[in-house]
């Protein structure tokens, strides 16, 4: 088999650049495969893992992952009955997909017991499910129409109890990506994406499915009078033979059209030539020669004469003016001498005779430089030769002591204290609970503000004038996604204590879960810390599930994000 030099070169380029894309840093974990995209990547996880980088162990005991553009999702053993106590996870990840459409072809599960939930994104979380399906939908003619999700990633969770298994479900899917990436259209064409197809809208001058063909505008022989046609993009150019011009060489050239005759001369056109009839006062082939009126040397006092048509202009030397440069200019007319100095006029110049204690070309320099009191803000002026030096009071700087030194520039106030600049001093206005010249002394623990626990969940506490504490709560996942379930937080602290105890309750998802924290605010190694005990209560549907409805645990909250501890759901 023969391999072209171009193919070898392309393979070399691919080999040299492989691994320099988004997958170059090997972001995918736990044996997953990284698929590079334009500015992004997608991880094809091994069974039992999900998350953007396949870094989250799901604990699923059935299901599978699909990475093709079309496929089928079926319950275990389908069409035979599925197993009891199944906990299945199906990941659908299709690189480059913009829309994934799912069609339920068959569905039969035990209603209120065995449910299928689906959602989008890298993490399968039933709290983020878009819909839930359960029951014998096929037999009851309740199969929903096809539904679609945006993006490259979707997930399905199927869980069963220990009673009455059924045959389960069969769901097919297909995806539509961006068929315009990479752009197949050539020569500046615009690509319009369609469903698993594209259309090229060609730039003027091109045709073909991919606009690969340049239209030959010379095919119609547009050039006349022997002109040679040169094809261009969306146009053509005619190279005319001598004597003709125009877009199509349709015009006989008029040699007088460029108005070659100067100074009002009249042009008479000929064949490839012309002749000029000159006005009086001009001569030459193009009437280019003017009669010289400067021949009589009319300009005086060394002025330079410039000839014009039937006239002349004198360019006078410095110090003279007039039509023929006959007048000496009086440079003292503008009174240039300052501070009472006398002006003596000369030729193109003047001399100032200064009064005592003044000097300079215009008598502008006072020999007593401190006479004008240049030093500001109490600075002391000292004459130094013809200049002065200002000795500034403490707190000021600058040539004239005009700058107030900002003692707050070094940010001396600690722990959020506000710095107020003074003259050669500063004052720190400390936040409540802090003292000292620089607010360096901590006196108590303040509940108000933002706190982070070991999982980097976040609570924000606001204390009202009545003593009640309000605020909100966001999980780390919600912070990462920028979307949070609606929450209501309320609580009360113990009053008039430096290290208060407190209790707060957060209601999430319109009452679906309620979490209560109790604890006390401490100062540990100079840092504010909340140590809390929590209990979480979740709404459930059955008596069996109520055994798992309550969870308890402990949290340590700090003012800064902490290193990750194990996640509760992992």
Swiss-Prot record:
Q: Report domain Avidin-like positions.
A: 443-562
- Sugar attachment sites are 30, 136, 357
Additional observations: Expressed both maternally and zygotically.
Give the Pfam families listed for this entry.
Avidin, CUB, EGF
The primary site where this protein sits is: secreted
Q: Where is the EGF-like domain?
A: 18-55, 176-212, 214-250, 252-288, 290-326, 328-364, 366-402, 404-440
Q: How does it assemble?
A: Homotetramer.
One cellular component (GO) term of this entry? extracellular region
Where does the secretion signal sit in this chain? 1-17
Which InterPro entries does this one have?
Avidin (IPR005469), Avidin-like_CS (IPR017889), Avidin-like_sf (IPR036896), Avidin/str (IPR005468), CUB_dom (IPR000859), EGF-like_Ca-bd_dom (IPR001881), EGF-like_dom (IPR000742), EGF-type_Asp/Asn_hydroxyl_site (IPR000152)
The residue ranges of the CUB domain are 62-175
What's the protein called, per UniProt? Answer: Fibropellin-3
Q: Which organism is it from?
A: Strongylocentrotus purpuratus (Purple sea urchin)
* GO MF annotation: an example: biotin binding
Where does this polypeptide localize? Secreted, Extracellular space
Q: Which terms are listed as keywords in the entry?
A: Calcium, Disulfide bond, EGF-like domain, Glycoprotein, Repeat, Secreted, Signal
Q: Which cysteines are joined by disulfide bonds?
A: 23-34, 28-43, 45-54, 62-88, 180-191, 185-200, 202-211, 218-229, 223-238, 240-249, 256-267, 261-276, 278-287, 294-305, 299-314, 316-325, 332-343, 337-352, 354-363, 370-381, 375-390, 392-401, 408-419, 413-428, 430-439, 445-521
Physiological role: Forms the apical lamina, a component of the extracellular matrix.
């Amino acid at each position: 088999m023969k391999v072209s030099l171009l193919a070898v070169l392309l393979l070399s380029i691919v080999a040299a650049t492989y691994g320099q894309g988004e997958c170059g840093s090997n972001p995918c974990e736990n044996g997953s495969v990284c698929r590079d995209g334009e500015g992004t990547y997608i991880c094809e996880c091994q069974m039992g893992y999900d998350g953007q980088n396949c870094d989250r162990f799901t604990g699923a005991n059935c299901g599978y992952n699909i990475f093709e553009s079309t496929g089928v999702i079926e319950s275990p053993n389908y069409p035979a009955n599925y197993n009891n106590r199944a906990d299945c996870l199906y990941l659908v990840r299709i690189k480059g997909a913009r829309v994934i459409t799912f069609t339920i072809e068959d569905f039969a599960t035990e209603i209120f017991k065995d449910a299928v939930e689906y959602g989008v994104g890298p993490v399968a979380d039933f709290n983020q499910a878009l819909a839930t399906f359960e029951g014998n939908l096929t037999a009851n003619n309740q199969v929903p129409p096809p539904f679609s999700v945006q993006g490259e990633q979707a997930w399905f969770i199927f869980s069963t109890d220990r009673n009455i298994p059924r045959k389960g479900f069969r769901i097919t899917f297909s995806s539509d990506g961006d068929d315009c990436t990479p752009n197949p259209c050539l020569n500046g064409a615009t690509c319009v994406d369609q469903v698993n197809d594209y259309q090229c809208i060609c730039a003027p001058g091109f045709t073909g499915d991919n606009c690969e063909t340049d239209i030959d505008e010379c095919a119609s022989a547009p050039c006349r009078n022997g002109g040679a046609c040169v094809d261009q993009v969306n146009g053509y150019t005619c190279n005319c033979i001598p004597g003709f011009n125009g877009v199509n060489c349709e015009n006989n050239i008029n040699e007088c059209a460029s108005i070659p005759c100067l100074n009002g001369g009249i042009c008479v056109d000929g064949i490839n030539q012309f002749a000029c009839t000159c006005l009086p006062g001009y001569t030459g082939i193009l009437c280019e020669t003017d009669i010289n009126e400067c021949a009589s040397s009319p300009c005086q006092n060394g002025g330079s004469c410039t000839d014009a048509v039937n006239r002349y202009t004198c360019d006078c030397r410095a110090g003279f003016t007039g039509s023929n440069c006959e007048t000496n200019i009086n440079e003292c007319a503008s009174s240039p001498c300052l501070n009472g100095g006398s002006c003596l006029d000369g030729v193109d110049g003047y001399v100032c005779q200064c009064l005592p204690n003044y000097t300079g070309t215009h008598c502008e320099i006072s020999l007593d430089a401190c006479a004008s009191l240049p030093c500001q803000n109490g600075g002391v002026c000292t004459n130094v030769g013809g200049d002065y030096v200002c000795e500034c009071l403490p707190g000021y700087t600058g040539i004239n002591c005009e700058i107030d030194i900002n003692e707050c520039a070094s940010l001396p106030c600690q722990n959020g204290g506000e710095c107020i600049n003074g003259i050669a001093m500063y004052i720190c206005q400390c936040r409540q609970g802090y003292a000292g010249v620089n607010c360096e002394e901590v006196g108590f623990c303040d509940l108000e503000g933002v706190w982070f626990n070991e999982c980097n969940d976040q609570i924000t506490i606001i204390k009202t004038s009545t003593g009640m504490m309000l605020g909100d709560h966001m999980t780390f996942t919600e912070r990462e996604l920028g979307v949070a379930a609606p929450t209501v937080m309320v609580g009360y602290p113990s009053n008039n204590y430096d290290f208060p105890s407190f209790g707060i309750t957060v209601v999430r998802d319109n009452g679906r879960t309620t979490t209560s924290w109790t604890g006390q605010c401490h100062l540990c190694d100079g840092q504010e810390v909340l140590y809390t005990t929590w209990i979480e209560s979740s709404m459930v549907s059955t008596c069996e599930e109520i055994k798992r409805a309550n969870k308890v645990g402990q949290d340590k909250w700090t003012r800064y994000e902490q290193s990750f501890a194990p996640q509760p759901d992992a």
